[in-house]
């Protein structure tokens, strides 16, 4: 079976880590090799850039365009050094976020032109598209409440409710426009989310239970 690139997307607090644990359980049950990674981050250099974007310790504002470019610098490292080589070796890749997050957070939330983000993806990632995107939809208020229970808010989580409303809108628009994307109501029970993920994997990849 050809290797697959699966991405889990959603607002902070949507339950992406839990969803990835379900994907891992499913792939392992079917004896399918996979690596599990995240963005921002995924490689040593990309993780350094992640820390700068999320926990800026300097007395200097990060411009929206600069934020986008730092994230994309990390994404290029991540894609070329980890994602692409794994897929070429026949290993599945499951990522917590990919370029959709830039479309939603930097495009929708920060107001960066979506055409700029698409250009970065086309020019530096060879227009890479995941085989499957599972988008976990959640009301921003509930998502932020969940995220705050996990730890102190990072720089982006402090952006405010309207920021996350704009971010959510772009996520939902992306789901409507792309055939390889499925939306799950992340406010439902963990058991229901798990069931939906398994059904999605069955449908898209014809894995055997």
Swiss-Prot record:
<dbReference type="GO" id="GO:0006233">
    <property type="term" value="P:dTDP biosynthetic process"/>
</dbReference>
<dbReference type="GO" id="GO:0005524">
    <property type="term" value="F:ATP binding"/>
</dbReference>
<dbReference type="GO" id="GO:0005829">
    <property type="term" value="C:cytosol"/>
</dbReference>
<dbReference type="InterPro" id="IPR018095">
    <property type="entry name" value="Thymidylate_kin_CS"/>
</dbReference>
<dbReference type="GO" id="GO:0006235">
    <property type="term" value="P:dTTP biosynthetic process"/>
</dbReference>
<keyword id="KW-0547">Nucleotide-binding</keyword>
<keyword id="KW-0418">Kinase</keyword>
<keyword id="KW-0067">ATP-binding</keyword>
<dbReference type="GO" id="GO:0006227">
    <property type="term" value="P:dUDP biosynthetic process"/>
</dbReference>
<keyword id="KW-0545">Nucleotide biosynthesis</keyword>
<feature type="binding site">
    <location>
        <begin position="10"/>
        <end position="17"/>
    </location>
    <ligand>
        <name>ATP</name>
    </ligand>
</feature>
<protein>
    <recommendedName>
        <fullName>Thymidylate kinase</fullName>
        <ecNumber>2.7.4.9</ecNumber>
    </recommendedName>
</protein>
<dbReference type="Pfam" id="PF02223">
    <property type="entry name" value="Thymidylate_kin"/>
</dbReference>
<dbReference type="InterPro" id="IPR018094">
    <property type="entry name" value="Thymidylate_kinase"/>
</dbReference>
<comment type="function">
    <text>Phosphorylation of dTMP to form dTDP in both de novo and salvage pathways of dTTP synthesis.</text>
</comment>
<dbReference type="InterPro" id="IPR039430">
    <property type="entry name" value="Thymidylate_kin-like_dom"/>
</dbReference>
<keyword id="KW-0808">Transferase</keyword>
<dbReference type="GO" id="GO:0004798">
    <property type="term" value="F:dTMP kinase activity"/>
</dbReference>
<comment type="similarity">
    <text>Belongs to the thymidylate kinase family.</text>
</comment>
<dbReference type="InterPro" id="IPR027417">
    <property type="entry name" value="P-loop_NTPase"/>
</dbReference>
């Amino acid at each position: 079976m050809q290797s697959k690139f699966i991405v889990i997307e959603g607002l902070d607090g949507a339950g992406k880590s839990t969803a990835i644990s379900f994907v891992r359980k499913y792939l392992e049950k079917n004896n399918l090799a996979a690596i599990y990674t995240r963005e921002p981050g995924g490689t040593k250099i990309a993780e350094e850039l992640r820390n700068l974007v999320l926990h800026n310790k300097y007395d200097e504002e990060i411009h929206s365009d600069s934020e986008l470019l730092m994230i994309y610098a990390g994404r290029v490292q991540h894609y070329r050094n980890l994602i692409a080589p794994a897929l070429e070796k026949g290993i599945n890749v499951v990522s917590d976020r990919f370029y959709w997050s830039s479309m939603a957070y930097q495009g929708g939330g920060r107001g960066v032109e979506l055409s700029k983000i698409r250009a970065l993806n086309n020019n530096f990632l060879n227009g890479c598209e995941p085989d499957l995107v599972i988008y976990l939809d959640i009301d921003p208020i509930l998502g932020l409440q969940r995220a705050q229970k996990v730890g102190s808010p990072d720089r982006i989580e402090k952006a405010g409710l309207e920021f996350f409303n704009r971010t959510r809108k772009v996520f939902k628009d992306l789901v409507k426009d792309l055939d390889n994307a499925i939306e799950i109501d992340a406010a439902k029970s963990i058991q229901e989310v798990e069931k939906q993920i398994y059904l999605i994997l069955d449908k898209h990849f014809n894995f055997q239970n």
